[in-house]
């Protein structure tokens, strides 16, 4: 996790992102970049009643909290993001509890609850070239959930 003493310019954060991921930085159409020198940056867009988080670089917990506050202020029902890490350590990192696991053709879907009892769903998105599975993450902002298509 980044600390507040690691201030960087936006270009320095982009360079850090590119070195860490091996990906070239780009911001998709419709996404807005939020940046703070000592926190990094996040790319966020609204899609209907969901706030989508595309890239986060820097203090991930800060940007998650920022996105949750922003989504709530905008009247969104859920946060949507992508998990490129192993799902179970990712779930533990956020303090979520797995309530149910589904296995379909060797791909797992994880139904979780956060510390406030709200639903979180990790669903397989695609398989990377190295064989790792990338997941869609839907975190509902109220107890219960709405259906998002």
Language model features by range: what are they?
Residues 121-144, 148:
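A cross-taxonomic marker for long C-terminal extensions/tails that follow the last structured domain
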Residues 47-106:
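Acyl-donor binding region in acyl/amide transferases
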Residues 55-60, 113-117, 138-145:
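Secondary-structure transition/turn motif
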Residues 2-4, 30-31, 93-98, 120-122:
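Short glycine-aromatic motifs
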Residues 97-114, 119-129:
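Conserved catalytic-core motifs of GNAT/GCN5-like acyltransferases
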Residues 1-23, 132, 137, 148:
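Short amphipathic alpha-helix that is part of the acyltransferase structural core
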Residues 27-28, 45-52, 102-106, 126-133:
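Short, ordered beta-strand-loop transition motifs
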Residues 18-49, 124:
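A conserved beta-strand-loop-helix scaffold within acyl/acetyltransferase catalytic domains
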């Amino acid at each position: 996790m980044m600390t507040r003493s690691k201030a960087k310019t936006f270009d320095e954060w982009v360079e850090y992102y590119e070195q860490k991921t091996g990906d070239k930085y780009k911001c998709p159409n419709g996404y807005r970049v939020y940046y703070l020198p000592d926190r990094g940056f996040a790319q966020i867009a609204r899609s209907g009643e969901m706030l989508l988080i595309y890239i986060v670089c820097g203090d991930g917990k800060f940007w998650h909290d920022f996105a949750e506050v922003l989504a709530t202020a905008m009247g969104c029902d859920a946060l949507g993001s992508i998990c490129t890490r192993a799902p179970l350590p990712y779930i533990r990192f956020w303090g979520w509890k797995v309530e149910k696991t589904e296995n379909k053709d060797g791909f797992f879907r994880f139904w979780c609850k956060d510390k406030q009892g709200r639903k979180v769903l990790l669903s397989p998105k695609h398989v990377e070239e190295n064989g790792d599975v990338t997941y869609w993450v839907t975190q509902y902002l109220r107890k219960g959930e709405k259906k998002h298509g």
